[in-house]
Curated annotation (Swiss-Prot):
This is Glutamate receptor ionotropic, NMDA 2B. Residues 1290-1301 have a biased composition (Basic residues). Expressed in the hippocampus including the dentate gyrus (at protein level). Detected in adult olfactory bulb, brain cortex, hippocampus, striatum, thalamus, superior colliculus, with much lower levels in inferior colliculus, midbrain and cerebellum. It holds the Pfam family Lig_chan. It comes from Rattus norvegicus. Residues 577-603, 624-630, 838-1482 are cytoplasmic. The gene is Grin2b. Keywords: Calcium, Cell membrane, Cytoplasm, Cytoskeleton, Disulfide bond, Endosome, Glycoprotein, Ion channel, Ion transport, Ligand-gated ion channel, Lysosome, Magnesium, Membrane, Metal-binding, Phosphoprotein, Postsynaptic cell membrane, Receptor, Signal, Synapse, Transmembrane, Transmembrane helix, Transport, Zinc. The modification Phosphoserine is found at S882, S886, S917, S920, S1058, S1061, S1064, S1143, S1255, S1259, S1303. Residues 1292-1304 are annotated as: Interaction with DAPK1.
Amino acid sequence: MKPSAECCSPKFWLVLAVLAVSGSKARSQKSPPSIGIAVILVGTSDEVAIKDAHEKDDFHHLSVVPRVELVAMNETDPKSIITRICDLMSDRKIQGVVFADDTDQEAIAQILDFISAQTLTPILGIHGGSSMIMADKDESSMFFQFGPSIEQQASVMLNIMEEYDWYIFSIVTTYFPGYQDFVNKIRSTIENSFVGWELEEVLLLDMSLDDGDSKIQNQLKKLQSPIILLYCTKEEATYIFEVANSVGLTGYGYTWIVPSLVAGDTDTVPSEFPTGLISVSYDEWDYGLPARVRDGIAIITTAASDMLSEHSFIPEPKSSCYNTHEKRIYQSNMLNRYLINVTFEGRNLSFSEDGYQMHPKLVIILLNKERKWERVGKWKDKSLQMKYYVWPRMCPETEEQEDDHLSIVTLEEAPFVIVESVDPLSGTCMRNTVPCQKRIISENKTDEEPGYIKKCCKGFCIDILKKISKSVKFTYDLYLVTNGKHGKKINGTWNGMIGEVVMKRAYMAVGSLTINEERSEVVDFSVPFIETGISVMVSRSNGTVSPSAFLEPFSADVWVMMFVMLLIVSAVAVFVFEYFSPVGYNRCLADGREPGGPSFTIGKAIWLLWGLVFNNSVPVQNPKGTTSKIMVSVWAFFAVIFLASYTANLAAFMIQEEYVDQVSGLSDKKFQRPNDFSPPFRFGTVPNGSTERNIRNNYAEMHAYMGKFNQRGVDDALLSLKTGKLDAFIYDAAVLNYMAGRDEGCKLVTIGSGKVFASTGYGIAIQKDSGWKRQVDLAILQLFGDGEMEELEALWLTGICHNEKNEVMSSQLDIDNMAGVFYMLGAAMALSLITFICEHLFYWQFRHCFMGVCSGKPGMVFSISRGIYSCIHGVAIEERQSVMNSPTATMNNTHSNILRLLRTAKNMANLSGVNGSPQSALDFIRRESSVYDISEHRRSFTHSDCKSYNNPPCEENLFSDYISEVERTFGNLQLKDSNVYQDHYHHHHRPHSIGSTSSIDGLYDCDNPPFTTQPRSISKKPLDIGLPSSKHSQLSDLYGKFSFKSDRYSGHDDLIRSDVSDISTHTVTYGNIEGNAAKRRKQQYKDSLKKRPASAKSRREFDEIELAYRRRPPRSPDHKRYFRDKEGLRDFYLDQFRTKENSPHWEHVDLTDIYKERSDDFKRDSVSGGGPCTNRSHLKHGTGEKHGVVGGVPAPWEKNLTNVDWEDRSGGNFCRSCPSKLHNYSSTVAGQNSGRQACIRCEACKKAGNLYDISEDNSLQELDQPAAPVAVTSNASSTKYPQSPTNSKAQKKNRNKLRRQHSYDTFVDLQKEEAALAPRSVSLKDKGRFMDGSPYAHMFEMPAGESSFANKSSVPTAGHHHNNPGSGYMLSKSLYPDRVTQNPFIPTFGDDQCLLHGSKSYFFRQPTVAGASKTRPDFRALVTNKPVVVTLHGAVPGRFQKDICIGNQSNPCVPNNKNPRAFNGSSNGHVYEKLSSIESDV
């Protein structure tokens, strides 16, 4: 047959190829890639077990199938191992090796590392020497070991020591490779740990030297720590332990911890290894050799499978050990990356870069007394689990065990023992806690599981245990009891802490263990370290605030003492000091005091002190005495302390509530008969304790009832109390007090504030007949003696609620607390009494020396006063010895003058009984006056009741003692400055207001320059020009040497000045005062008077203008008076009326009409030379015409003169103010100084300082009835403007009136229209007090022999003005005395000396001889008893009878009195207003 053509066709070969490929794919699916792995076992390994392990079908899910070659070897030398592995590579084409041996030779691991680095074959050492620690592996090696690294084993060692609180240790190593890593790992761990490690020694032993054991012994003797870490080989460890045993480092109290390298094969234990040796080893029990072989095969297979999956190839098998291709190196490095990260069956089998397992299975083994390794712990997932909660300290049987390490049991019960968990960060207990083990009781528990949990204990009893252990010097292991609580005997067996001690599982029991008789039978108790007993806790009830809570801050003694000091002592002391003080309310040592005025009573003193204590803003009257002020000041300081202390404690007592306990004690009816209450009273306790035992033994019925309400623990009982399930909880007092203090919200309290029943104490239970009891007792007593026990109690047993209670409850301030302030009040009273005595001594004895009397110089008081004044006002004080010693300086001294002024004002204010009259002087004075008392700053004068009375005749020589004193003192002084008194009063005592009715006539030439205290630079003229001749020379000689002002204030009479002294309180005067009317335009002057302020300054202005008008000398056509620098003076006063910025706008009135109708008369007077002061030579005799008078109108004073009077006056020059004829005044002198001609006065008027007589005002008064005509003759040549009385009366109607006050009385009487009822008068018993020796007794009496002016006057008067209250104001008599000796402002040398010495004036009364005044050659001849005839005209009722109103003002031309004026020192007529300002200037 012939072959077919189809067989050779191309289609045929294609089918064959497809079939071939399909066949190859089928074969590939049936047989996956495989990897050859050799398992080499050295020694007596169980091959059957290994075979079963790798034959199991555990790798079917992998893409690579392991092809295992099982090889057994007996030789362990390096040559045999290398030859056998190389043969397997060439014959079996293996790609990995799993090596296991049963030796302790670490050299096998080094050989395997070398083979792997040369052949690039992965080798796994899983057991024996191949798995031992190896340091410094080759970088290209693929050798991996089933075992922990050096660092891992060092960490486990530290965890073991931390578990049992072994913080003090030492390290011993040899030069075996890896020792540096071991030491460095331990150092770095303890440095970065929170545990307080103490590494004492690090010993490096050199085992290569053959110098015997001496060197190693010397090194080991340095070790003192109880824990020693050893790193070396097993052979080296055998030698080291032998030497350590010789030096006593392997006995009881020393613990050695070694790594797995030392332990080696656990089946063989060298005899040198000490009992109790601890080793960290690979887990041989739970991770045996078959499991390791299987995991080794799985690691290589899984890595190859992962490589195949990612790269589609696996490493090619190696055919020889002697050649290595680059391709093989690449594949081996790639496989190494997969070998490091392997996970098999959910287990992490990864390796580190050094070839060690990342998560090895380690165990802690202990060499027990049977010389076998016992597994006591496990290290898994970086956590340590130990079998023993108290480390069993083992020692050789030949040695006796020392009892210095004790096992102590405790019970959790705050605050005595508080159990906490370990710190989650460090896994250890904090520094203030102690590790304590808690057993785990579980039915399903296996032997491998640990039987305890590590906890941390702290508390009051734990701190006591720590202190006792340091004192007695023992160590301990602490664990928590699990069998019961404190301890109770059940069926003859004790449980709890007492049971642990009885069974000798613990040496001691520490905690809240109550000492009782039953327990003391089986154990010994130490002395009690805290007192306790049985207490009852209840829920807090609602409290109430006591009604007397506001009194609680102070005790009753303090309240009583305060009121006693207030009402009896302090108030009485202030009143007494004030009453007897020289300047107090109730003393009248100063004559200016108003009798019957305000007084300081005992009631006011109590009211004042009461207001100071309680800060009451009620009106009180303050004392004035220095002593009483000191007392009140100290009382105010006491009030501050008292009130501050009261306020500080008041809030605490006001919020403090009183709580009522529900039960009073264990014998309370609620406990003994709980069912009698509705609902029944519920109470219970924690069973199996001393509290239950006590109740059972003493209260059987109570114990039976409370069984159903017993609680499992204290926390459960507290919760039941808060929720209302329980009414009372009976338990240990110390525990309940702590719980009450720490309760949230402080809702739970113990009855009776911690009342204790059946008192006992807590103690430490010790084994019976133990040697520790005495040492423990002494240690506890030492804690009490050192005060440490009190510190522990304050730290642990004091709760928050106790602190809050202490903060709220404030103890009462008893008398001891407030004693200091009462002592202060007593000292203040003593000081006040001393001050009171010193005040009177100074006032009555030493005051005069401080005034300069003793030294003759200005006193200290004067110097200080003037020094302060000089500092404030800048006034220089001249205290030259020559000046101050002169009599003139003494009388010109401002200080002396002011003192006299004050003395005079006081005497004026206290007049009572005028010349024996039953009426008081105060009846004539108005209380509402603006004039104030100098010393008291009060209004001291009252208005008159306008009743007339008969003035009793005065004695002729009433003031003879003053006259005698003046004569005796100044009789031999020469004449000096006769006008100085007049000039002094011109400058300093000016009227303040317009008090009388007058009109403005003639030309106004008033010179009132601006006020200044500086002396004027005006050229002086002799003051003795125009003085009278020998008739008054003796009088001038008597007074000329003393003046109130020095020569610097003297000047021309034609330029009358208006000075004020340094103590003046006058106001600025307004007005245009130029004297020449020809140079003044009418409209300009009228405009200057428009809308001037209607204030006190206006009244002052009118007084100045009128006074200047009255002072203006007579004028003649050829004698005119001119001012210096008139334009400047006029501009100055025009500026006074211009509105100024920042000044108040006064109410203005238009006064232009006052001068409107008089302007023409002024011009005529100016042309004719006439005026108010017309020369007497121009008067005619024997005619009815009057020439040279004002406006041709006869003045009222002219009507009082007869023809004979006019004839007498026409022949010569007369006094300006009185009828005295000036015989020694020549016409030559008058011609030289015409300005002084019309204002010349007699010596009597000069001495009195009178500017005018009061009767001069009669020329300005309007008469309601026409006066009788008086024929007056005058020269026809001088008659210019004759006018009849009718024309004069008509002209007066057009005049505007101004009221001017000329005296103190008239000023006060200005406000009489609004006066109220008459004030109280001075009692009659004070009538004679001011009469004898008073310089003002003359004010309300007339000279002897005169009954009234109306009967003796030769001039017709308007009779209806007499004693008519409604007739208008009348010019009253000046307050100044009528005689020169009565003038208090004219001091005498004797007066001055008496004032300096602080004594009364030594005036003496002499009997007056009838007619002596007519014959005596001295100035007494001037005193006359003739009546002074005055006619008063006015629209205002007079203050006194007209017969006692002596005139103080006269017409400047002709006097209205025929008789010469008596030397009247009181006729000045000036008023001192607001004397308080004068006093303040002093």
